[in-house]
Amino acid sequence: MKFYNSTNEIPEEMLKGIDLTYPQLTYLPETGILYDNTYNEKTVPIISGGGSGHEPAHVGYVGSGMLAAAVTGPLFIPPKSKNILKAIRQVNSGKGVFVIIKNFEADLKEFNEAIKEARTEGIDVRYIVSHDDISVNAYNFHKRHRGVAGTILLHKILGAFAKEGGSIDEIEQLALSLSPEIYTLGVALAPVHFPHQKTSFVLAEDEVSFGIGIHGEPGYRVEKFEGSERIAIELVNKLKAEINWQKKANKNYILLVNGLGSTTLMELYSFQYDVMRLLELEGLSVKFCKVGNLMTSCDMSGISLTLCSVKDPKWLDYLNVPTGAFAW
Protein backbone atom coordinates (compact mmCIF):
# COMPACT_ATOMS: atom_id res chain seq x y z
CA MET A 1 0.00 0.00 0.00
CA LYS A 2 1.00 3.62 -0.57
CA PHE A 3 0.13 6.85 1.23
CA TYR A 4 -2.19 8.35 -1.35
CA ASN A 5 -5.85 8.22 -2.24
CA SER A 6 -5.54 7.08 -5.87
CA THR A 7 -2.91 7.01 -8.60
CA ASN A 8 -5.01 9.50 -10.59
CA GLU A 9 -5.17 12.05 -7.77
CA ILE A 10 -1.65 11.88 -6.38
CA PRO A 11 0.14 14.27 -8.81
CA GLU A 12 -2.45 17.01 -8.23
CA GLU A 13 -2.48 16.52 -4.46
CA MET A 14 1.32 16.41 -4.33
CA LEU A 15 1.62 19.71 -6.19
CA LYS A 16 -0.96 21.35 -3.94
CA GLY A 17 1.02 20.11 -0.94
CA ILE A 18 4.23 21.64 -2.31
CA ASP A 19 2.39 24.92 -2.93
CA LEU A 20 1.25 24.96 0.71
CA THR A 21 4.75 24.18 1.97
CA TYR A 22 6.85 26.73 0.06
CA PRO A 23 5.54 30.34 -0.14
CA GLN A 24 7.88 31.15 -3.03
CA LEU A 25 6.24 28.48 -5.21
CA THR A 26 2.82 28.75 -6.83
CA TYR A 27 0.81 25.90 -8.30
CA LEU A 28 -1.74 26.51 -11.06
CA PRO A 29 -4.48 23.93 -10.31
CA GLU A 30 -5.30 21.26 -12.89
CA THR A 31 -2.32 22.25 -15.09
CA GLY A 32 0.69 20.52 -13.50
CA ILE A 33 2.49 23.90 -13.55
CA LEU A 34 4.54 24.90 -10.52
CA TYR A 35 6.42 28.19 -10.87
CA ASP A 36 8.72 30.42 -8.85
CA ASN A 37 6.69 33.49 -7.89
CA THR A 38 9.92 35.35 -6.98
CA TYR A 39 11.39 34.79 -10.44
CA ASN A 40 13.54 37.66 -11.76
CA GLU A 41 11.91 38.79 -15.01
CA LYS A 42 15.16 40.43 -16.12
CA THR A 43 16.68 36.98 -16.68
CA VAL A 44 15.90 34.19 -19.15
CA PRO A 45 13.54 31.62 -17.58
CA ILE A 46 14.34 27.92 -17.80
CA ILE A 47 11.59 25.31 -17.62
CA SER A 48 11.48 21.53 -17.67
CA GLY A 49 9.10 18.76 -16.76
CA GLY A 50 7.78 15.30 -17.46
CA GLY A 51 5.63 12.65 -15.89
CA SER A 52 5.26 12.46 -12.13
CA GLY A 53 6.90 9.64 -10.22
CA HIS A 54 10.44 11.02 -10.54
CA GLU A 55 10.33 13.33 -7.53
CA PRO A 56 12.04 15.48 -6.56
CA ALA A 57 12.44 15.95 -10.32
CA HIS A 58 11.32 18.25 -11.65
CA VAL A 59 9.26 20.25 -9.16
CA GLY A 60 11.98 20.15 -6.52
CA TYR A 61 14.29 22.11 -8.80
CA VAL A 62 12.01 25.11 -9.24
CA GLY A 63 13.57 28.12 -7.57
CA SER A 64 16.04 30.97 -7.95
CA GLY A 65 19.14 29.75 -9.76
CA MET A 66 17.47 26.69 -11.28
CA LEU A 67 14.07 26.33 -12.98
CA ALA A 68 11.55 29.14 -13.26
CA ALA A 69 8.81 26.54 -13.71
CA ALA A 70 8.22 22.80 -14.02
CA VAL A 71 5.30 21.03 -15.68
CA THR A 72 4.19 17.68 -14.28
CA GLY A 73 2.02 15.03 -15.92
CA PRO A 74 0.38 11.84 -14.60
CA LEU A 75 2.51 8.97 -13.30
CA PHE A 76 5.22 8.30 -15.91
CA ILE A 77 3.20 10.21 -18.55
CA PRO A 78 4.42 13.60 -19.82
CA PRO A 79 2.28 16.73 -19.44
CA LYS A 80 0.02 17.76 -22.28
CA SER A 81 1.38 20.29 -24.76
CA LYS A 82 -1.34 22.79 -23.80
CA ASN A 83 -0.02 22.87 -20.22
CA ILE A 84 3.59 23.15 -21.35
CA LEU A 85 2.51 26.09 -23.50
CA LYS A 86 0.81 27.69 -20.49
CA ALA A 87 4.05 27.33 -18.52
CA ILE A 88 6.03 29.00 -21.31
CA ARG A 89 3.56 31.88 -21.36
CA GLN A 90 3.58 32.11 -17.56
CA VAL A 91 7.32 32.78 -17.28
CA ASN A 92 7.93 34.60 -20.56
CA SER A 93 9.04 38.19 -20.04
CA GLY A 94 10.32 38.92 -23.53
CA LYS A 95 13.88 37.63 -23.17
CA GLY A 96 13.11 34.17 -24.53
CA VAL A 97 12.40 30.90 -22.73
CA PHE A 98 14.78 27.94 -22.53
CA VAL A 99 13.33 24.42 -22.22
CA ILE A 100 15.05 21.24 -21.03
CA ILE A 101 13.43 18.05 -22.41
CA LYS A 102 14.22 14.46 -21.44
CA ASN A 103 14.72 12.21 -24.46
CA PHE A 104 11.57 10.08 -24.51
CA GLU A 105 9.30 9.86 -27.54
CA ALA A 106 6.16 10.96 -25.71
CA ASP A 107 7.95 13.86 -23.98
CA LEU A 108 9.43 15.07 -27.25
CA LYS A 109 6.02 15.04 -28.91
CA GLU A 110 4.29 17.13 -26.24
CA PHE A 111 7.14 19.59 -25.72
CA ASN A 112 7.76 20.08 -29.44
CA GLU A 113 4.08 20.85 -30.03
CA ALA A 114 4.13 23.44 -27.25
CA ILE A 115 7.37 25.02 -28.47
CA LYS A 116 6.06 25.22 -32.03
CA GLU A 117 2.89 27.00 -30.88
CA ALA A 118 4.82 29.36 -28.58
CA ARG A 119 7.04 30.37 -31.47
CA THR A 120 4.00 31.22 -33.60
CA GLU A 121 3.03 33.58 -30.77
CA GLY A 122 6.35 35.36 -31.10
CA ILE A 123 8.08 33.81 -28.08
CA ASP A 124 11.74 32.97 -28.66
CA VAL A 125 11.90 29.40 -27.33
CA ARG A 126 15.12 27.39 -27.42
CA TYR A 127 15.63 23.89 -26.04
CA ILE A 128 18.04 21.07 -25.31
CA VAL A 129 17.20 17.36 -25.34
CA SER A 130 18.86 15.56 -22.43
CA HIS A 131 20.12 12.12 -23.54
CA ASP A 132 22.61 11.03 -20.89
CA ASP A 133 21.57 7.36 -20.49
CA ILE A 134 24.13 4.96 -22.01
CA SER A 135 22.08 1.79 -21.46
CA VAL A 136 21.42 -0.42 -24.47
CA ASN A 137 18.37 -2.21 -25.79
CA ALA A 138 18.71 -5.88 -24.79
CA TYR A 139 17.40 -7.05 -28.18
CA ASN A 140 19.49 -5.04 -30.64
CA PHE A 141 22.11 -3.41 -28.35
CA HIS A 142 21.34 0.05 -29.70
CA LYS A 143 22.04 2.88 -27.27
CA ARG A 144 18.85 4.14 -25.65
CA HIS A 145 20.03 7.73 -25.02
CA ARG A 146 17.17 8.42 -22.62
CA GLY A 147 17.12 11.57 -20.52
CA VAL A 148 17.70 10.49 -16.92
CA ALA A 149 19.41 11.76 -13.74
CA GLY A 150 22.12 13.71 -15.56
CA THR A 151 19.36 16.09 -16.64
CA ILE A 152 19.65 17.65 -13.17
CA LEU A 153 23.09 19.00 -14.07
CA LEU A 154 21.48 20.90 -16.94
CA HIS A 155 18.91 22.32 -14.51
CA LYS A 156 21.57 23.55 -12.11
CA ILE A 157 24.31 24.78 -14.41
CA LEU A 158 22.02 26.46 -16.95
CA GLY A 159 19.86 27.86 -14.16
CA ALA A 160 22.83 29.44 -12.39
CA PHE A 161 24.13 30.86 -15.67
CA ALA A 162 20.71 32.34 -16.44
CA LYS A 163 20.57 33.88 -12.96
CA GLU A 164 23.95 35.47 -13.69
CA GLY A 165 22.38 37.20 -16.69
CA GLY A 166 23.19 34.88 -19.59
CA SER A 167 21.27 35.64 -22.79
CA ILE A 168 19.08 33.09 -24.57
CA ASP A 169 21.83 32.64 -27.20
CA GLU A 170 24.49 32.11 -24.53
CA ILE A 171 22.32 29.65 -22.59
CA GLU A 172 21.72 27.66 -25.77
CA GLN A 173 25.46 27.49 -26.50
CA LEU A 174 26.23 26.42 -22.93
CA ALA A 175 23.58 23.69 -23.14
CA LEU A 176 25.02 22.38 -26.41
CA SER A 177 28.49 22.27 -24.84
CA LEU A 178 27.40 20.69 -21.55
CA SER A 179 24.86 18.05 -22.56
CA PRO A 180 27.24 15.81 -24.61
CA GLU A 181 29.58 15.56 -21.61
CA ILE A 182 26.97 13.96 -19.32
CA TYR A 183 26.72 10.14 -19.08
CA THR A 184 24.51 8.01 -16.82
CA LEU A 185 23.88 4.31 -16.20
CA GLY A 186 21.44 2.77 -13.72
CA VAL A 187 20.88 -0.53 -11.92
CA ALA A 188 17.99 -1.99 -9.91
CA LEU A 189 17.51 -4.60 -7.20
CA ALA A 190 13.71 -4.39 -7.41
CA PRO A 191 11.22 -2.85 -9.87
CA VAL A 192 8.60 -0.15 -9.37
CA HIS A 193 5.48 -1.28 -7.52
CA PHE A 194 2.06 0.30 -8.11
CA PRO A 195 -0.95 -1.08 -6.23
CA HIS A 196 -3.09 -3.43 -8.34
CA GLN A 197 -0.64 -3.28 -11.27
CA LYS A 198 1.92 -5.74 -12.59
CA THR A 199 5.58 -4.77 -12.45
CA SER A 200 7.34 -4.19 -15.77
CA PHE A 201 10.03 -6.73 -14.88
CA VAL A 202 10.65 -9.33 -12.20
CA LEU A 203 13.81 -9.97 -10.18
CA ALA A 204 14.57 -12.62 -7.61
CA GLU A 205 15.75 -11.37 -4.22
CA ASP A 206 19.36 -12.17 -5.13
CA GLU A 207 19.32 -10.63 -8.63
CA VAL A 208 20.26 -7.25 -10.08
CA SER A 209 19.28 -5.70 -13.43
CA PHE A 210 21.76 -3.43 -15.24
CA GLY A 211 20.61 -0.60 -17.50
CA ILE A 212 17.06 -0.11 -16.19
CA GLY A 213 15.01 2.98 -17.08
CA ILE A 214 13.29 5.57 -14.90
CA HIS A 215 9.85 4.43 -16.08
CA GLY A 216 10.46 0.90 -14.89
CA GLU A 217 11.92 -0.31 -18.18
CA PRO A 218 13.94 -3.55 -17.80
CA GLY A 219 17.70 -3.48 -18.24
CA TYR A 220 20.07 -5.17 -20.66
CA ARG A 221 21.32 -7.90 -18.30
CA VAL A 222 20.27 -9.68 -15.10
CA GLU A 223 22.78 -11.44 -12.88
CA LYS A 224 23.26 -12.54 -9.28
CA PHE A 225 23.88 -9.72 -6.82
CA GLU A 226 27.48 -9.83 -5.54
CA GLY A 227 27.68 -6.60 -3.57
CA SER A 228 27.98 -2.86 -4.07
CA GLU A 229 31.58 -2.99 -5.26
CA ARG A 230 30.73 -5.38 -8.11
CA ILE A 231 27.97 -3.02 -9.28
CA ALA A 232 30.30 -0.03 -9.01
CA ILE A 233 32.87 -1.82 -11.19
CA GLU A 234 30.26 -2.58 -13.86
CA LEU A 235 28.90 0.96 -14.01
CA VAL A 236 32.29 2.66 -13.89
CA ASN A 237 33.66 0.39 -16.63
CA LYS A 238 30.66 1.03 -18.89
CA LEU A 239 30.92 4.79 -18.34
CA LYS A 240 34.68 4.61 -18.89
CA ALA A 241 34.20 2.93 -22.27
CA GLU A 242 31.56 5.45 -23.32
CA ILE A 243 33.45 8.54 -22.20
CA ASN A 244 36.80 7.15 -23.45
CA TRP A 245 38.57 9.12 -20.76
CA GLN A 246 42.01 7.71 -21.53
CA LYS A 247 42.04 10.01 -24.57
CA LYS A 248 40.77 13.04 -22.65
CA ALA A 249 43.37 15.50 -21.39
CA ASN A 250 40.91 16.69 -18.76
CA LYS A 251 40.71 14.35 -15.75
CA ASN A 252 38.29 16.44 -13.68
CA TYR A 253 34.74 15.13 -13.27
CA ILE A 254 31.36 15.84 -11.74
CA LEU A 255 29.77 12.83 -10.03
CA LEU A 256 26.12 12.17 -9.19
CA VAL A 257 25.07 9.11 -7.19
CA ASN A 258 21.31 8.97 -7.54
CA GLY A 259 18.82 6.86 -5.63
CA LEU A 260 15.86 5.60 -7.65
CA GLY A 261 13.27 5.76 -4.88
CA SER A 262 13.65 3.32 -2.02
CA THR A 263 17.44 3.08 -1.81
CA THR A 264 18.61 4.34 1.59
CA LEU A 265 21.25 7.03 2.09
CA MET A 266 23.34 4.41 3.88
CA GLU A 267 23.41 2.36 0.68
CA LEU A 268 24.00 5.38 -1.55
CA TYR A 269 27.02 6.61 0.41
CA SER A 270 28.44 3.09 0.64
CA PHE A 271 28.14 2.81 -3.14
CA GLN A 272 29.65 6.27 -3.57
CA TYR A 273 32.67 5.15 -1.52
CA ASP A 274 33.18 2.18 -3.86
CA VAL A 275 32.90 4.45 -6.92
CA MET A 276 35.31 7.06 -5.57
CA ARG A 277 37.98 4.42 -4.91
CA LEU A 278 37.64 3.12 -8.47
CA LEU A 279 37.85 6.60 -9.98
CA GLU A 280 40.94 7.33 -7.90
CA LEU A 281 42.59 4.20 -9.29
CA GLU A 282 41.80 5.49 -12.79
CA GLY A 283 43.53 8.78 -11.99
CA LEU A 284 40.35 10.84 -12.15
CA SER A 285 39.61 13.74 -9.84
CA VAL A 286 36.02 14.32 -8.68
CA LYS A 287 35.62 18.08 -8.29
CA PHE A 288 31.93 18.01 -7.38
CA CYS A 289 29.87 15.15 -5.96
CA LYS A 290 26.20 14.97 -5.05
CA VAL A 291 24.50 11.96 -3.44
CA GLY A 292 20.77 11.46 -2.90
CA ASN A 293 17.39 10.87 -4.48
CA LEU A 294 17.71 13.34 -7.36
CA MET A 295 15.55 11.75 -10.07
CA THR A 296 13.65 8.69 -8.91
CA SER A 297 11.42 6.01 -10.36
CA CYS A 298 8.73 5.98 -7.67
CA ASP A 299 9.79 3.26 -5.21
CA MET A 300 12.33 1.40 -7.34
CA SER A 301 15.23 -0.04 -5.36
CA GLY A 302 18.14 1.09 -7.45
CA ILE A 303 20.98 3.48 -8.15
CA SER A 304 22.19 5.44 -11.14
CA LEU A 305 25.68 6.82 -11.62
CA THR A 306 26.35 10.00 -13.59
CA LEU A 307 29.73 11.32 -14.71
CA CYS A 308 30.32 14.64 -16.45
CA SER A 309 33.69 15.83 -17.71
CA VAL A 310 34.46 19.35 -16.48
CA LYS A 311 35.06 20.88 -19.90
CA ASP A 312 34.79 24.39 -18.45
CA PRO A 313 35.81 25.20 -14.83
CA LYS A 314 32.92 27.67 -14.64
CA TRP A 315 30.54 24.69 -14.55
CA LEU A 316 31.79 23.97 -11.05
CA ASP A 317 31.12 27.56 -10.03
CA TYR A 318 27.55 27.28 -11.31
CA LEU A 319 27.02 24.04 -9.38
CA ASN A 320 28.01 25.83 -6.18
CA VAL A 321 25.89 28.95 -6.70
CA PRO A 322 23.16 29.01 -4.01
CA THR A 323 19.67 28.19 -5.23
CA GLY A 324 16.17 28.57 -3.87
CA ALA A 325 15.15 25.14 -5.21
CA PHE A 326 14.17 23.02 -2.21
CA ALA A 327 15.52 19.69 -3.53
CA TRP A 328 19.06 20.73 -4.48
Curated annotation (Swiss-Prot):
GO terms for biological process: glycerol catabolic process. InterPro entries: DhaK_1b, DhaK_dom, Dihydroxyacetone_Kinase. One of its GO terms (molecular function) is glycerone kinase activity. One of its GO terms (cellular component) is cytosol. The modification Tele-(1,2,3-trihydroxypropan-2-yl)histidine is found at residue 215. Keywords: Transcription, Transcription regulation. It holds the Pfam family Dak1. The keyword Nucleus does not apply. The keyword Transcription regulation applies. Residues 6-328 form the DhaK domain. Coiled coil: none annotated. Coactivator for the transcription factor DhaS. The heterotetramer formed by DhaQ and DhaS functions as a transcriptional regulator. Activated by covalent binding of dihydroxyacetone to DhaQ. The complex activates the dhaKLM operon. NCBIfam families: dhaK1b. Homodimer. Interacts with a homodimer of DhaS. This is DhaKLM operon coactivator DhaQ. The lineage of its organism: Bacteria, Bacillati, Bacillota, Bacilli, Lactobacillales. The gene is dhaQ.
